[in-house]
């Protein structure tokens, strides 16, 4: 996963994705921490990529 921190990211370029790191605990609500914007984003168990800052795909 390639994430690039750009300070406090609010928007990403149209062709980029918001990269989040999942620090959620089992049996609890997931907590996603915004890592930055990336043009190449791959999801894993602990990483999530979204097209918006609200993580609404």
UniProtKB/Swiss-Prot annotation:
One Gene Ontology term, aspect cellular component: extracellular region
Keyword line: Disulfide bond, Ion channel impairing toxin, Pharmaceutical, Proton-gated sodium channel impairing toxin, Secreted, Toxin
SUPFAM superfamilies named among the record's database cross-references: Snake toxin-like
Keyword Methyltransferase in record: no
Tissue expression profile of the protein: Expressed by the venom gland.
Record's subcellular location: Secreted
Cystine connections: 3-19, 12-37, 41-49, 50-55
Pfam entry (one): Toxin_cobra-type
GO molecular function, one term: ion channel regulator activity
UniProt keyword Ligase, yes or no: no
InterPro entries found in the cross-reference section: Snake_3FTx (IPR003571), Snake_toxin-like_sf (IPR045860), Toxin_cobra-type (IPR054131)
Similarity comment text for this entry: Belongs to the three-finger toxin family. Short-chain subfamily. Mambalgin sub-subfamily.
Function summary: This three-finger toxin inhibits ASIC channels. It acts as a gating modifier toxin by decreasing the apparent proton sensitivity of activation and by slightly increasing the apparent proton sensitivity for inactivation. It binds more tightly to the closed state and to a much lesser extent the inactivated/desensitized state of ASIC1a. It interacts directly with the outside surface of the thumb domain of chicken ASIC1a (ASIC1a), but does not insert into the acidic pocket as suggested previously.
Protein name per UniProt: Mambalgin-3
Species the sequence originates in: Dendroaspis angusticeps (Eastern green mamba)
